[in-house]
Amino acid sequence: MLSLRKTIASLVRNRGRWEKLLRAARRAPAPGAGAVPIRLQEAHGFGSNPGNLRMFSYVPAGLKTPAPLIVVLHGCKQRAATFARDAGWLDLAESTKAVLVLPEQKGVNPFWYDVAWVAPLVGLLGANNQNACFNWFQPDDAAHDRGEALSIAQMIAAMIARYPVDPGRVYIAGLSAGGAMTAAMLAAYPERFAGGAIVAGVPYGCADTVIRALDCMNPGVDRKPEEWRQAD
């Protein structure tokens, strides 16, 4: 008890000091405040774009020598710009002089996310997926030269044609639905990528409908390696 009383007494004595420090911390500018925000460039006319995706990119200033290209795929209910910033991709591109291409899914207004009666109206609202998820579970969007997969491949080709990008150093990474689409891209275009990273995604070929996609995520699907190899 003596130790507890001493601890409480010490906290009381130093209360004013801690309050001053906290007030100073609240007044201090956030890290990076005042710096010019890094903006992504939206590109048009990069191909036939059968998947109806938006294309954003970031190219470090003064890039002259062939640079690596990283394809970054966001998760559901996310946007390319916020994912690139919050996940540190823009900082990585600046520090390593890597070029980024950031496909963005067309979802409905965030106000309508998860609203059941909106689902049948997604196409009429100009969206591909209600919650802005990449359609990794749709065969017409996740196969070689089909839909969203082909749109992403066209973005890569456009970046290689327009900027000093090393074709031998093209990488892809994605989170959640973006991770699942990353798996699809690696399976559909293995010759295109030097490597990839799947974060919280699912294996390619796990689902071909929305219902099966939900099963892949929970409770999950367990298959033998040879069964996954045969998935299409």
Model-derived features: where do they sit?
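A domain-start/cap signature at the N-terminus of enzymes
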Residues: 1-69, 81-99, 144, 149, ...
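Gly/Ser-rich "nucleophile elbow"/oxyanion-hole loop immediately N-terminal to the catalytic nucleophile
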Residues: 61-65, 115-123, 129-177, 187, ...
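Alpha/beta-hydrolase
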Residues: 71-73, 103, 199
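Extracytoplasmic, non-cytosolic globular domains
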Residues: 183-201
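Short, solvent-exposed loop/turn and secondary-structure capping segments
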Residues: 80-86, 111-115, 129-135, 184-185, ...
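Active-site nucleophile loop of the alpha/beta-hydrolase fold
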Residues: 105, 197-206
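Active-site glycine-rich loops that stabilize anionic/oxyanionic intermediates
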Residues: 75-79
